[in-house]
Amino acid sequence: GSVVFSYKAMGYWPAVLAGLATAFAYLGVAAWEGPAFSTAINYVVEIPKAGKLWSIKGDDVYVSVACVSIIASLIITYLNYKGAKQAAVFQTIATGGLIAVGLVFLTGGAFMGKPEYTKPLFTDFKGFSAVLLMVPAMFVGFDVIPQSASEMNVPLKKIPKILILSICAAALWYMAMIFATSISAPASVRLNGVIPVADAMAFNFGSPVWGKICIIGAICGILTSWNGFLYGGARVLYALANAKMLPEVLAKIH
């Protein structure tokens, strides 16, 4: 991954910095997954608000909601602690759930949506700029693939092809979901909704139940990225320790 690439290109310390930057990037995203998970769960089943901690920009933070994220974090951590095989099985199941719900959403948008919901196709440069700023974040995490190369039962020469293919597939998936959201509901529903994608699916299918089904698919997506970042972060630290760039205790495989 980034550690080996940086080491061969620039030497020891750039490789250390690249590895630590990658690990902290994974940690940052993994920290975001917790609140995202509890928000999604709250859409499906309302979480009781108990034990107010503080408020941030008008939004209250409660112990009960935080506990949901903490429990999910412990489960994901345990799966990764058990080993790569268990994490891979979990990843496969969650990815299947995400794809299934996404295909239902896309099919519903294509057959029941209305083209006029997409108008105006363009407004001003502000909207374009906002999306452009978000796009790089959508592609964070694909370097987990080379990080896990040592545990993949795949010829090393095929890994670059898998990486490029996964990025292209993700780009197509993002575009498909944007299309489905745009054509499934008018702008008023999308802009005023709590979670626009779920609200668009509920509107298109004519029942709030479908919004909850959409969120279940989103939860699968959150769990896959959460699992992937923990897996990738652990492998980055292992690579650094194995190269004597971090304490050797991190290079031990239990």
Language-model regions, residue ranges each:
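TM-loop-TM module centered on a large, flexible mid-protein loop between adjacent transmembrane helices
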Residues: 1-7, 11, 43-50, 164-227, ...
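Interfacial helix-capping/hinge residues at the ends of transmembrane alpha-helices
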Residues: 2-3, 142-146, 198, 234
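Juxtamembrane helix-boundary/capping and inter-helix hinge elements in multi-pass membrane proteins
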Residues: 8-13, 150-159, 165, 241-247
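Structural signature of transmembrane alpha-helix termini at the membrane-water interface
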Residues: 31-34, 38-48, 78-85, 104-114, ...
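Membrane-interface loop-to-helix entry segments
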Residues: 41, 64-112, 122-127, 163-168
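Transmembrane helix-loop junctions in multipass membrane proteins, especially transporters and channels
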Residues: 47-51, 81-88, 110-118, 139, ...
